[in-house]
């Protein structure tokens, strides 16, 4: 169950849409978003964690994200997700299974943090950012509260390094007691990825079971 919880987290970073926003917060998010809008390609090292308050269980896994325009490859020890601009491939090595789908644009925005951090026009309320110092770094914490009561989370927060406006952490606080955290450990922008790096090669997995739901 733990691995499926993390897969759900990978697939549901949650679209950042909020209204009646604080101008100071918008200015911070603009600067963070521009890092990726202006980049030829971005690579991130991530730590993905789930904390279940009801059971006390904690699960985490490290991952690597490569993204350019609308394409991305998100790799962890238990699954690889690859979106080539049209199709999404999810490979799970423990069961040797590949799932192929053609998700809507809004669904893809939920999976790639660089897309998420640029979508902040409506749908959320956001107060003035909080400021603090962590490990010698001055940071801002921007919190978002969904206006739609049907959302399965009640708060989302983004930590931003004020020295370079890079995101440090994205945390989603679920109504079910689940706290999902993405720690961004390292960011490299203006990467020049080859086409081969961003396209899923089915030939590499000749014995994998393929589930095509396109």
Feature roles, as predicted:
Residues 4-13:
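Sec-dependent N-terminal signal peptides
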Residues 16-57, 68-71, 204-214:
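N-terminal leader/targeting segments and the immediate start of mature chains
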Residues 48, 76, 92-93, 171-174:
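Beta-turn initiation residues at beta-strand->coil junctions
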Residues 54, 94-96, 176:
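Solvent-exposed strand-loop boundary residues in beta-sheet-rich modules
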Residues 62-111, 180-181:
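An acidic-aromatic
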Residues 87-145:
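Surface-exposed, polar helix/loop patches in the mature regions of secreted/periplasmic/lumenal proteins
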Residues 127-206, 211-213:
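Gly/Pro-enriched, hydrophobic low-complexity segments
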